[in-house]
């Protein structure tokens, strides 16, 4: 992804599980990761962002 691209990160915590979703608003592609609720939000956000980058590259055929 380009350095200037906007990404939204959403967190949902339910019980002892946290779900982080990275969303690219330009394409509408979403990537979700799950982890323990006590995991650092930065770690979950980074994992979701990396998964989103992977999915976007896969979609582009690279």
Residues covered by each model-derived region:
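Amphipathic, hydrophobic secondary-structure cores in small proteins
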Residues: 4-59
């Amino acid at each position: 992804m380009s350095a200037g691209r906007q990404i939204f990160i959403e967190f949902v915590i339910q019980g002892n599980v946290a779900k982080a979703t990275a969303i690219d608003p330009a394409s509408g592609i979403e990537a979700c990761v799950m982890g323990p609720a006590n995991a650092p939000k930065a770690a979950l956000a980074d994992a979701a962002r990396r998964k989103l980058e992977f999915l976007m590259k896969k979609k582009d055929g690279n």
